[in-house]
């Protein structure tokens, strides 16, 4: 029997079996023709070409060869030896060559959508249509597709230390289904996470979705979570997606109000130290006995090694303007949250109170002084004026 030109590329058992079948059935007639697909499965990477092998044991009956993906009424025509245009499909051997029995094909630029079972089918020439005669057992084509770069997303709103936040990781378009996903925080592997691969059944490609739960600490401004994906299609290092905890954490400030020494006896300098807060956004208001004295927005900040910030504000108080003790309050609004505050009681010394009283007393007496002078000197002035008038009149008569 004739030997397919491309058979040297086929596995030896397949070649021997085909030759044996040909010798046993070479003159037995068309019912003995065998369609041989030697490979039950073929796996290629996306973008590569896939070779699907098929050989016949006889040229009888006369008729074309066709390739289909899938079986039954919904099968898809991949190649027709007789007619049609199939730009991605080429034949491995020269089909016009005399006594050719090799009907293997190659499909270029494979994508995950090409996955499936392919059947090599022999048709018998008929009128008006050819009739299916015999089909091969089928070759399952699986496509190895790389997963997309993992995308990590954090919580929509910030949370404070000691609270738990969730991070999600997604990757799509990979095949086969087997995949490994791990979570890390600052290089330490996490254990509190759940992962799903969809769909659950067979598919041309798959997606993975994982959610990790992370407990925040005050030192997490510089921390990072990593989603790591390993897959058979990846060469070298696994794929990684990252998220910064600085986008998820809010560290509330601590307040300390103190009085600083001053050279001037009638002035007091009170400071409000706002420490270890994150993010930057902060507004501070000073109140004197509950009344707003000044409001300012933090600008020049000092950054700590852990990524948090410090800021100091001061208030200069004229103690002479107060006869009683003053309650000074430092009120801080941070990152749009409810204001926090701390108060300081500024004591007015007895000397300052007495000094303030003297000033007030003198100021109260000052307007009455001219009146007292007028009351004391008035009669004497009137007497002098009267005597002067009499003397002038007597002088004129004389």
From Swiss-Prot:
CDD domains: IgC1_SIRP_domain_2 (cd05772), IgC1_SIRP_domain_3 (cd16085), IgV_SIRP (cd16097). This is Signal-regulatory protein beta-1. Immunoglobulin-like cell surface receptor involved in the negative regulation of receptor tyrosine kinase-coupled signaling processes. Also participates in the recruitment of tyrosine kinase SYK. Triggers activation of myeloid cells when associated with TYROBP. The gene is SIRPB1. Glycans are attached at residues 244, 269, 291. GO terms for biological process: cell surface receptor signaling pathway; positive regulation of phagocytosis; positive regulation of T cell activation; signal transduction. Residues 147-246, 253-347 form the Ig-like C1-type domain. Detected in monocytes and dendritic cells.
